Amino acid sequence: MASLRELRSRIRGVNSIKKITKAQELIATSRISKAQARVAAAKPYAEEITKVLGELASASKNLSHPLLTERPNPRRAAVLVITSDSGMCGGYNSNVLKRAEELMTTLRNEGKEPVLYVMGAKGLTYYTFRNRPFVSAWTGFSQQPKYTDASAACRHLVDAFMVGSDGEVPHPNGTGDIAGVDELHIVYTRFVSMLTQTPEVRRLAPIQVSFVDENFDMGEDSFSDSPTAEVQAQYEFEPDADVLLAALLPKYVNTRIYASLLEAAASESAARRTAMKAATDNANELASVLQREANSVRQAQITQEISEIVGGVNALASSSDRD
């Protein structure tokens, strides 16, 4: 059995850790509310660009834009994986990385070469440690993403898709050129509720033609295109619909990436809150167990001291009687 000093030292250590986990839990809780507010702020723009694209799609004479066209023999597929920049969020990163591995396995089985892109320091560390090749990584904004953060990745990904696997585009790090891709996929964590976050895979390009009946609320499929919706043209466009469609489609892809970043940020905070609450509860339980053990040790020490005193008194009494 551990000594009383050791037990008290462990109790102090557990209580110190509990303060950290409790603080992290409170911070994560507040960040979830902020993430929900950012989703609400981004929703009007996402809905309007989707509405305009729907009108443009119906007014366009031909939908032959590369972002809307299926490649006959796709050979390379870009995979953008969104992870967190910091840890202490339970299985958040491991789940999304596992889903990314499943996607890349599926792509290989289909005869496509996965081309990896990473967002978040944890994903960067994961693939670097395992010597897994990736084209580029963007870090430093997982908890508070901005539209410009999505734009940094979107510009390169759209350019790579436009040229296709037969063409080349400048490397995002400015270190030469790399081959293009025929598909764009994104792997992120969808925010379902405070207790549930699920890793999701979405294909960014080629884009499905229908752009209406979409839901942009957090916890729902932020960009689930309806295959049966019908769009009626209500506007006269200048310049023509084809030109506007070509200009807005990359912005639409950027909006989808940004929406995924916002959901991932909320999911990260929710996962961290759940993990830190569990850690705090475990710390409380462990501290209680250690305190009971310390009380037992202290009680045994007191009992032993009393026994020694009583034994000493009896010995003195016996000595006095003999005298």
Curated annotation (Swiss-Prot):
SUPFAM superfamilies: ATP synthase (F1-ATPase), gamma subunit. GO terms for molecular function: ATP binding; proton-transporting ATP synthase activity, rotational mechanism. One of its GO terms (biological process) is proton motive force-driven plasma membrane ATP synthesis. Disulfide bonds: none annotated. Its main location: membrane. It is a peripheral membrane protein. It is found in: Cell membrane. Keywords: ATP synthesis, Cell membrane, CF(1), Hydrogen ion transport, Ion transport, Membrane, Transport. Gene3D superfamilies: 3.40.1380.10, ATP synthase, gamma subunit, helix hairpin domain. Transmembrane segments: none annotated. One of its GO terms (cellular component) is plasma membrane. HAMAP family: ATP_synth_gamma_bact. PANTHER family: ATP SYNTHASE GAMMA CHAIN, ATP SYNTHASE SUBUNIT GAMMA, MITOCHONDRIAL. Produces ATP from ADP in the presence of a proton gradient across the membrane. The gamma chain is believed to be important in regulating ATPase activity and the flow of protons through the CF(0) complex. Belongs to the ATPase gamma chain family. F-type ATPases have 2 components, CF(1) - the catalytic core - and CF(0) - the membrane proton channel. CF(1) has five subunits: alpha(3), beta(3), gamma(1), delta(1), epsilon(1). CF(0) has three main subunits: a, b and c. NCBIfam families: ATPsyn_F1gamma, PRK05621.1-2. This is ATP synthase gamma chain. The lineage of its organism: Bacteria, Bacillati, Actinomycetota, Actinomycetes, Mycobacteriales. The gene is atpG.
